[in-house]
UniProtKB/Swiss-Prot annotation:
The keyword Signal does not apply. This is Diphtheria toxin repressor. Homodimer. The lineage of its organism: Bacteria, Bacillati, Actinomycetota, Actinomycetes, Mycobacteriales. SMART domains: FeoA, HTH_DTXR. The keyword Zinc does not apply. It is found in: Cytoplasm. Belongs to the DtxR/MntR family. Residues 4-65 form the HTH dtxR-type domain.
Length: 228
């Protein structure tokens, strides 16, 4: 499977992202994420199914085979290690990190990946708080970590809560307008905020600045409640 094209890796990573966000991975969701037509996605998924990487379930959701999941984990691991390098060492503008890492994930050699694990201070989570998967496969002892916190969209309706931002999933990173609004408000990983889940939207407030996220993006923010 060494000759797999980047399109296949992008599809597998997208399915992995959807699973992380608690969204059923359907071909329609991939079309939305990758801005591709329905027929193009269907053709690519059919090829991936023939290659033994995914299985289309009776409910039309996509399930990765063990081989497909292994490749998805490898791609996501390189992606998030690249994000750490770009942020911690190169100092790239945080708004450009995700797109740049999307390029690096397809070309990073295994040797470079292992070297990154040695030189980076934090290889367990990306700069956006997302767990870096499959570190044991490259020689780093690590127990599997469950996703921390709760999705903002799953918070009790109508309650104004104190919370700490712990994860910003990929779909929010590519919505530069919303991502910029959050960073302009001083919201980043570890920031304590006021947050309220209203019907159809989530409002995050920090230092007097409020950012409204619709449901489609609110599921991409994970928080931990802060007592007191």
């Amino acid at each position: 499977m060494k000759d797999l094209v980047d399109t296949t890796e992008m599809y597998l990573r997208t399915i992995y992202e959807l699973e992380e966000e608690g969204i059923v991975p359907l071909r329609a969701r991939i079309a939305e994420r990758l801005e591709q037509s329905g027929p193009t996605v269907s053709q690519t998924v059919a090829r991936m199914e023939r290659d033994g990487l995914v299985h289309v379930s009776p409910d039309r959701s996509l399930e990765m085979t063990p081989e497909g999941r292994s490749l998805a984990i490898a791609v996501m691991r390189k992606h998030r290690l690249a994000e750490r390098l770009l942020t911690d060492i190169i100092g790239l503008d945080i708004h450009k990190v995700h797109d740049e890492a999307c390029r690096w994930e397809h070309v990073m050699s295994d040797e470079v990946e292992r070297r990154l694990v040695e030189v980076l201070d934090d290889v367990h989570r990306s700069p956006f708080g997302n767990p870096i998967p499959g570190l044991g496969e490259i020689g780093l002892d690590q127990a599997d970590e469950p996703d921390s916190g709760v999705r903002a969209i799953d918070l009790p309706l109508g309650e104004n809560l104190k919370a700490r931002i712990v994860q910003l999933n990929e779909i929010l990173q590519v919505d530069l307008e919303q991502f910029q609004a959050l960073t302009d408000a001083g919201v980043e990983i570890g920031t304590e905020v006021d947050i309220i889940n209203e019907q159809g939207r989530v409002v995050i407030t920090h230092n007097g600045s409020s950012v409204e996220l619709i449901d489609d993006l609110a599921h991409a923010v994970r928080v931990e409640k802060v007592e007191g």
